[in-house]
Amino acid sequence: MAQTNPNYATPSSVRSVTSYPARRGYKQAVDPALDHVVGVDDAIDIHCHAHEGQQDALGVAKLATKSGMKGILYKTIVGRKNPAGTVAGVRQALESWCAEKNLLPTHLWPGSSVTQGFLSKIEPAWSAKQLKAGVVGLWMPNNTSANTLSLVGGKPSAWDKNADPKAHTEPLPWDEALKYGHYLLDEKGRLQPEIEEIFRMAHDQNAAIFFGHPTKPEFHAMAEYSQKIGFKKGVVDHPFSPFVNLTIEEMKDAASAGLWLNFTFDELSPLLGIDPANMYKAIRSAGPEHCTLSSDAGEPLFPNSVESLRLLRGYMAAFGCTADEIYTMSTVNPAFIVGLELETKQRASAGR
């Protein structure tokens, strides 16, 4: 894939032409006094954050349960060294609470990064340990990727114990980004053997791999290797984000190559500002059967993950996705990624 620099965060004067008909035509009764969120029935969030300084893992699980969600995959959670163990504790607490409230608990799954932080080598043994413990999704490098450091910089305290913990660098030159961050390719532009081994492990254990924040060469190499080994659970997180930065045509190609496109509320948030009309165009181009909708929420500048999902689903419905397509992207496809068997792939209200 050639390097591209698309801009899908259209100016307000442009996006208002498509957004006003959408917002005026979409109706959803929302009572702010409710103790749950409407409009997220059966949804599975495959990208939820609950680590230090973010939303509470048990609290968001309770809200998801009350709101009728089917499940949450925690990308991050307090206790990152043992995410499966931490999620097991949250699950136990949720089940006890649900027994008191006579509610059916939402499913909870652990995810894990393939890294153990900046300056640490990516070791297959780490991922093998997480998969054995019950992790269902592995994330390639995100904030620790060389690509991220070259685009937005990072917190130098992560690689320099004497640095100000509140400091954040400017974007780093590529040679510095490579010094402190992770890069998945060898000197010949091929996936490092350790990365290929992790893909094979995930394939053998029916786990997903989220591609993280790759450069285009890294992305292309992961896509090719997924095809080579017949891997069906390669997920392209937030494809509009500057850390992935695909064009809509590239998203269509990725879907045709067997990858999942995981669109997120983060992309639509004011912090990234993607025009929801363009996200809808991407879904229509790639096909809802290749797409998922998730929150990528948890930080205090966002709504909680349950409300973020309501908003994301609402935006896509307002711009033209049908109820069946929303169900496919929010329930059927995420269920495949986390390995949940559904009783039916048809939404409960279909045919009524």
Regions found by a protein language model. Give the residues of each.
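An N-terminally biased module of ancient metal coordination in phosphate/nucleic-acid-related enzymes
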Residues: 1-107, 125-128
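Mid-to-C-terminal alpha-helical segments outside catalytic/metal-binding sites
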Residues: 2-4, 15-17, 306-352
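Histidine/acidic residue-rich metal-binding segments in metalloenzymes
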Residues: 29-39, 58-65, 86-98, 122-134, ...
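Active-site mouth loops of central-metabolism enzymes
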Residues: 41-58, 109-120, 185-190, 212
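Divalent metal-dependent hydrolysis catalytic cores, especially in the metallo-beta-lactamase
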Residues: 45, 60-83, 103-116, 135-145, ...
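Active-site metal-binding loops of divalent metal-dependent hydrolases
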Residues: 48-50, 77-78, 113, 142-143, ...
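His/Asp/Glu-enriched short active-site or ligand-binding loop at hydrolase and phosphoryl-transfer sites
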Residues: 258-270
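Short acidic/histidine-rich active-site segments
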Residues: 264, 288-305
